[in-house]
Structure formats: C-alpha cells, structure tokens
Design a protein with these regions (language model features):
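Catalytic Walker B motif of ABC-type/P-loop ATPase nucleotide-binding domains
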Residues: 96-100, 105
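Conserved ABC ATPase signature
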Residues: 71-80
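Conserved ABC ATPase "signature" region
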Residues: 52-70, 89
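Conserved ABC transporter NBD signature motif
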Residues: 2-18
Length: 146
C-alpha cells in the first residue's frame, strides 16, 4: 500500500483532474458531432475558457485548410489523431500522459508535435508517453521496456 504524489500532494481525483490529461488510443470524440462541436465539448468538460482566435491559431498548427464543420466519423485515422493533439494543446494541463502519440501522423505533424513537446518541457511541463517510434526530443529521460 502506498501513494503517488505530485508537487508534494497525494494525487486524488481533484488533483488528477486539475493537473493531468491522458490521451490514449481509444475513441475520445463523438462521431456524430463536427470537429468544432467536439472541440467545444472537450473544452467545456475540462472547464477551459478560450476565444476563437486562440482556437483557430491552435487548429492551424495541426490542420491546414480543414473544415471544422466536418463530422468526426469522416476523418482519417491521422486526422483523428491530430484532433487529439489539438485538444491536448488547448486544454494544456501541467502533466500530459500519452499513449503512442506519433502513430498515424505525417512527417510535418510529427515535427510540429516535437516542437510542441519541446515548448511544454521548456515551460517545466511533464510528458509521460509510450511510443513505438524513436523520440527526437532534447533533454528528456527514457525508460526502455522490452
């Protein structure tokens, strides 16, 4: 029996919801909603206040000329993955826990994601991730599991 702490506090539901964001492989969005509706829903459940210019700038970081009125079920696997990463960026909790964030992404998006990770780490954020790809970040620690 034991406990896990974060910033010298035992992690409970409140601390977990305020400080941690998990993005996994499972479906995280509603198929029948548009991208825009999914973004607004995701931000509302995480109590994130945003304005449209920040949202649009973030959308353009991962998507070039994507119609936000497109339904989620119409997206490719890679586009769905980009939406996950966009939501990660918009919610921006101190600790990100990610399951294989690079799968299904094109080269340009992987570069953008690495840049996003670098900025997160520069700002004293924490990223815990599992990946099948080689990671090309600076100043990170790895634990190789086989």
């Amino acid at each position: 029996e034991g406990s896990i702490t974060y910033n010298n506090l035992v992690i409970d539901n409140h601390i977990a919801s305020q400080s941690f964001l998990y993005i996994g492989e499972t479906n995280f969005a509603h198929d029948s909603l548009t991208l825009n509706q999914n973004i607004e829903y995701w931000l509302s459940i995480h109590n994130v206040k945003f304005n449209n210019s920040i949202k649009n700038k973030s959308v353009n970081y991962f998507f070039q000329e994507l119609n936000l009125d497109k339904k989620f079920y119409q997206l490719s696997f890679g586009q769905k993955k980009k939406l996950q990463l966009l939501l990660l960026m918009l919610v921006n909790k101190p600790v990100w826990i990610l399951d294989d964030p690079f799968s299904g992404l094109d080269d340009r998006t992987i570069i953008n994601l690495n840049t996003l990770f670098e900025k997160k780490l520069e700002n004293k954020g924490i990223i815990i991730l599992a990946s099948h790809q080689n990671i090309t970040l600076n100043n990170y620690k790895t634990l190789q599991l086989t």
